[in-house]
């Protein structure tokens, strides 16, 4: 018997013509959902075992939430790689896939998923035999393993003109085998074979946040630029936008995916890549919800209508048919925006004599009522967020449709029971009513308590604990005022150096997500962090404290020395004040300790409060021991020049190694007063907060031009220094792939608010090392 299961969660919210199919699809072909593995691996390529684990993750989403994935695509390195062509007969391929693609294609097929692969357009060699081998291999992927997609990329190389004919012939055979085969063309001239291309890369943009796509404006999160992306001018769907990257800077990924799936809604949608297993456990139901909602309506989402920007905001679109439309709205400003939505032909709805039902589907589901055709309703969109609104005159497709309260669907596809999370503000009571859905239930419960009236179409009252907020949780607190350079400017600077880190962006995502209780998620995360190439790139400060001298943490120089001022210090935070007899620094070789040389003296700086620093002289070497027994208690350690590469940092007390589980280090931030890092202008804001929501944070928006790494922010709480652990664009990092984007304007620093800050005097500072023309604000 079906059961309706509801749980409550306090939240902060505001209501608010067919052509020949030469390329495998037409403008009216429904989208296919895709994941591709770029950033899960880089040009070294995937392996069979890692792919098996990743497919297990998607099988879990399929079985748990009913999520359908049409295509799982290997990215670079599986066969072809950057500037090279490969073969399934090569030793390299056999090392990566000892049993070939067969087991993986069968594993994918068990959940109705087809494999795809990144490749180059050529590889036909210089003889007829070599050309035949290439064509047979690529055709065999489709014939023998039911591959459904090739992503052909100029990174591998262009197609030679004398190979136009074998390419065209190969793709003609593939189209015969699989008429719906998808060929993605990334920056390639394929000659006559261009007719086989399904899509072309939209704007040439990749979407790896803060590597290839980063904010150009101040914003409360890292994905403001991503949600600013435009749809193709002619609303073509036969292009590819590189999907949504789930690897770095994950907050508000769902807005990004809503706009990709329901806004641009290209032939590949929803399209994600990299490391979706980095999401928090509680976010996976929403990932599945977006995929499932899109799949339910994908046949009609192919029809698009631009909405007037003056009424509906930037890049607003309506998709659907005469009876059902989905509107994607966005707000690219710091204040909430209310849009007036006309329930008529302006939004694509055609009058059939029935009421128009309006329902918000993102950022949560909320019933907006039934209205007469031609009415106008208002929908509020939160700052730097997206909204998805459904208008329909048709019967409800949702199994459950509630009114009176915002909610998320946790699971309505797998199994008989439907699970809903009710959302509410602290101290508020809601009257929840079950509207007519397309399923019938024998019972209902809220937080384990019977609420069977809901199953019969009745109502229930739901109250949320806590006190109602006096003010809207998102608000401007202050426009910061210019002030004298504070005497403790170095301490403020160091507070953020110690609060932040230089780990790979993926490591930061793991820290955001916390531990998982889902075996398939843990396996996929571990498969990523334990892959040999990730460990070998020295991207994680954890390697300094793991007791394994074969792992290291290094200053990344692969793309040259990109440190501000070409200098950086080593910062070590012990997590709490301690007394130690010795600090031991280990390096793998003499080169690694540069710019130091063995048997030279150096100074180590120790502090308990970021104000008073005690120098300790020690002798440099591949194993350097600093005697700290007379230093008293300290928490913060600073070495003016960071060694290029360290394998371990140890602490000893009474002959025993101390616990280092709370230690962390960074190696890319300058020391104050070096490399141009000196405060020339300052701004301050002082205030007290008597209320804020759980998970709240301050945004210090540095509006204006400040130069590359030319401005900083931090806070004092009743005199205690509190740094910013995050910033958009991201703090410089030892990146997993490519490099951090560098910007010289409009950085936004983030400071988490904790319960101990309530009622305390908060002093927020912005420090500029260059420009006096900033207009900082605190939100």
Each predicted region: which residue ranges?
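Short beta-strands within extracellular/lumenal beta-sheet-rich domains
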Residues: 311-317, 554-577, 588, 675-691, ...
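Conserved structural scaffold segments of CAZyme catalytic domains across common CAZy folds
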Residues: 21-116, 122, 268, 274-309, ...
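Aromatic- and carboxylate-enriched substrate-binding clefts and catalytic-loop regions
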Residues: 68-254, 648
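Surface beta-strand/loop "capping" patches
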Residues: 303-324, 395-428, 666-691
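C-terminal beta-sandwich/jelly-roll accessory domains of carbohydrate-active enzymes
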Residues: 322, 329-527, 532, 536-550, ...
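Aromatic, loop-rich ligand-recognition surfaces of beta-strand-rich domains
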Residues: 20, 548-612, 626-671, 699-705, ...
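Active-site-proximal substrate-binding groove within the catalytic cores of carbohydrate-active enzymes
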Residues: 171-172, 177-366, 372, 376-388
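Bacterial N-terminal signal peptides
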Residues: 7-14
